[in-house]
Amino acid sequence: METWQELKVTVKREGEELVSNLLIELGAQGVAIEDSMDYVGNVDRFGEIFPEVEQQEEIVVTAYYPDTVDVTVVEADLQARISELTDFMDLGELKIGTTALAEEDWADNWKKYYEPARITHDLTIVPSWTDYEATAGEKIIKLDPGMAFGTGTHPTTKMSIFALEQVLRGGETVLDVGTGSGVLSIASSLLGAKEIFAYDLDDVAVRVAQENIELNPGMENIHVAAGDLLKGVEIEADVIVANILADILIHLTEDAYRLVKDEGYLIMSGIIKDKWDMVRELAESAGFFLETHMVQGEWNACVFKKTKDISGVIGG
């Protein structure tokens, strides 16, 4: 019987995406997240409130490796990679532990973290292996979160979808920068966007996004490609959305202003509290005006508008 190894990394919440992606780059076959914030204010589909859970500043990233991988080498490589990034982000004191799993345990552990989740009034994210009957008017996003890009329920993703729901009216062109699982592209299509162009620097993300898009019928209007932010892109868009770390977002704003049509929008998420002022200042210096600012826990998201009429924007 094949066995698997479970490697758990305890890290500050803002390090979730960074550590998850590093673990995948170091050979993980899947990653799951345990975050006490996921239970705050949650209700199930019948309206029942989940029990109170003590809130922690740290989350646990669990990575799965086949027994052919030497996880001690993975641990050492992970520590080395993170030490190079400590100037950009305080991840706290890493705690790392490993456990051996049988193959059937791997399958059970992998899927137990993922349940259907109502993200907005109209959109529900459903794991690809789950039978789910939609209610009247409910739109379903099928996702297979099997390669670490999450289930779409992280606060940064939720706020991105809220923002898309705010600005999309139908018929728009959308650029999805750092698409990851492809969830924001799929959401954009369901919310009426005419054409979506999704980019990611990571070849794994490009493949996973394409696979998730194929799980959802009618998504022929989504085009996925490898790309480094918006470098070399010449497609004008009504909306640009980027759910990536703040230290990467700051390299996006000038190209975004070049490509967003007049009266169009730039949505940015994945911004920790300490980086918010920096991101806002750079977006405004590029020419955008802040229209909406959202906060959930440590995370910030925002909607900026490219407009000459500033009467309806913050500070206008």
Curated annotation (Swiss-Prot):
Its EC number is 2.1.1.-. Keywords: Cytoplasm, Methyltransferase, S-adenosyl-L-methionine, Transferase. Coiled coil: none annotated. It is found in: Cytoplasm. Its main location: cytoplasm. It comes from the Bacteria. SUPFAM superfamilies: S-adenosyl-L-methionine-dependent methyltransferases. One of its GO terms (molecular function) is protein-lysine N-methyltransferase activity. The keyword Transferase applies. InterPro entries: Ribosomal_L11_MeTrfase_PrmA, Ribosomal_PrmA_MeTrfase, SAM-dependent_MTases_sf. It catalyses: L-lysyl-[protein] + 3 S-adenosyl-L-methionine = N(6),N(6),N(6)-trimethyl-L-lysyl-[protein] + 3 S-adenosyl-L-homocysteine + 3 H(+). GO terms for biological process: methylation. It is an enzyme of class 2 (transferase). S-adenosyl-L-methionine binds at T157, G178, D200, N243. GO terms for cellular component: cytoplasm. NCBIfam families: prmA. Methylates ribosomal protein L11. Belongs to the methyltransferase superfamily. PrmA family. This is Ribosomal protein L11 methyltransferase. The gene is prmA.
